[in-house]
């Protein structure tokens, strides 16, 4: 559900919270690194290079006064300073990778001149240009209509498979998670209450997961009233 802490966890992995925020985990292991105890200088070598994060809505993530191609190139230049010609070539290459037609024309466009689907593809290009090992996708299709959503998800799935990337996919859409993910962590009030293979979601054991699934509308088996999730205080402590 909204407010369960999904995006909070994704941002915590990249130390994107303000300094006053408290992370309760004793460690956050990524390959050979404990992200919890890295300095800001060390995190700059991880953030955007080894781990990238795709945000929810490109309208709020892209700079409105800089053409989108330069924003993609900037992600490359952050980790390879001074190589502007190579950065532009890489940005054009990434626009082709994310299946944007006429990449040289789109490179010069500003965020208000592109569609929502193009914007999310550009965000994906920006996050992949540094060849990361892990992508955190924070509800990357929530702002898109259904047909464009499926196109972007198909593209993301192809890129993850072909490049051998790890993917943390954050979503509140159980049916989407069921079809797109391998394993699911179900969160409630900032806690993981169940870890389950996506193919086994119909056999979930935790009452919260069961309640979420049971409250979904079903076109094949219509019900006049959807059940209301009955919450239990024990979910906060078990």
Show the residue positions of the predicted features:
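Conserved ABC ATPase "signature" region
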Residues: 34, 86-105, 213-214
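Hydrophobic anchor residue at the start of the ABC signature
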Residues: 72, 124, 135, 148, ...
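ABC ATPase NBD coupling module
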Residues: 35-52, 78, 200-204
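A short, surface-exposed alpha-helical micro-motif characterized by mixed small hydrophobic
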Residues: 177-179
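A short, proline-enriched helix->beta-strand linker immediately N-terminal to the Walker B motif
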Residues: 129-133
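Short catalytic/signature loops enriched in Gly
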Residues: 101-105, 196-238
């Amino acid at each position: 559900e909204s407010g369960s802490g999904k995006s909070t966890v994704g941002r915590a992995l990249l130390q994107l919270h303000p300094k006053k925020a408290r992370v309760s985990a004793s460690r956050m292991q990524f390959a050979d690194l404990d992200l919890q105890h890295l300095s800001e200088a060390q995190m700059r070598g991880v953030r955007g290079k080894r781990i990238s994060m795709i945000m929810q809505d490109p309208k709020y993530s892209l700079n409105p006064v800089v053409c989108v191609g330069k924003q993609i190139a900037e992600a490359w230049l952050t980790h390879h300073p001074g190589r502007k010609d190579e950065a532009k070539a890489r940005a054009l290459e990434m626009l082709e990778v994310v299946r944007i037609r006429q990449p040289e024309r789109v490179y010069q466009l500003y965020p208000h001149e592109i569609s929502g689907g193009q914007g999310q593809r550009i965000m994906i290009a920006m996050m992949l240009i540094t060849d990361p090992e892990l992508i955190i996708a924070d509800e990357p299709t929530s702002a898109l209509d259904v047909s464009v959503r499926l196109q972007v998800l198909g593209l993301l799935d192809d890129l993850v498979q072909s490049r051998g990337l790890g993917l943390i996919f954050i979503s509140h859409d159980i049916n989407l998670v069921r079809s797109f993910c391998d394993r699911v962590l179900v969160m409630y009030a900032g806690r993981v209450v169940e870890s389950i293979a996506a193919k086994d979601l119909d056999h979930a054991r935790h009452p919260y997961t069961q309640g979420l699934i049971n409250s979904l509308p079903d076109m094949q088996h219509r019900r006049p009233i959807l059940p209301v999730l009955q919450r239990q205080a024990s979910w906060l402590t078990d």
